Amino acid sequence: MDLATLLGLIGGFAFVIMAMVLGGSIGMFVDVTSILIVVGGSIFVVLMKFTMGQFFGATKIAGKAFMFKADEPEDLIAKIVEMADAARKGGFLALEEMEINNTFMQKGIDLLVDGHDADVVRAALKKDIALTDERHTQGTGVFRAFGDVAPAMGMIGTLVGLVAMLSNMDDPKAIGPAMAVALLTTLYGAILSNMVFFPIADKLSLRRDQETLNRRLIMDGVLAIQDGQNPRVIDSYLKNYLNEGKRALEIDE
């Protein structure tokens, strides 16, 4: 569970709801018609932008914003160095006995053990990276589309409410409440866009970048093992993938 995503979502809504309660009754901020326009309208408009597979596939990818935990690059480097040492001592077949928890790393090692040359291994791993990145980009795009559409649907709902209000001006006392209800759709659209959809899209983009970086690290490590490079050289080379802070920490140790 990603604590930052969960805390951000709950905390953001908690403060907004608290402000509503302090400003008056929470009931004045609830309107079922406005919710239907923003939520229902957004779903079907976004559905028009994507295929059914891309739309519903985004719900699976969305779980990565809350549940996904990327492998730490230093842990991947340590595992690759361990495998490089084993390969130098016992050959590539010795890698079959090692426990590998990362599926992409396992795929690369399987290609080595099967005896494929470096070009085949590189091409296969690059293709895997590209296709995974494409799937994640599509999933992120769905949530960005929701973030774009929700405020627009909110504005449409507000315009609908204003038209209904202006068509019935007989009772001046009803104008204020009618205007408040009309503005609720804009509020709902802004809340969903800026507190749900765009933050999830940004977190998914971060996850995608982290996963792509890790996979490139693994690919370079697997190819270095295949090339028979010294484990120390591999370790030094792969540490270029670490950020400056972690690299400095590694040097100090």
From Swiss-Prot:
The residues exposed to the Cytoplasmic compartment are 201-253
Which GO terms of type biological process are on file? bacterial-type flagellum-dependent swarming motility; chemotaxis; proton transmembrane transport
The question of whether Transport is a record keyword is answered with: yes
Query: Which GO cellular component terms are attached?
Result: plasma membrane
Pfam family of the protein (one): MotA_ExbB
Residues annotated as transmembrane: 6-26, 28-48, 146-166, 180-200
Q: How does it sit in the membrane?
A: Multi-pass membrane protein
What does this chain do? PomA and PomB comprise the stator element of the flagellar motor complex. Required for rotation of the flagellar motor. Probable transmembrane proton channel.
Family from the record: Belongs to the MotA family.
Kindly give the NCBIfam families that the UniProt entry links to this protein.
PRK08990.1 (NF006527)
Q: What is this protein called?
A: Chemotaxis protein PomA
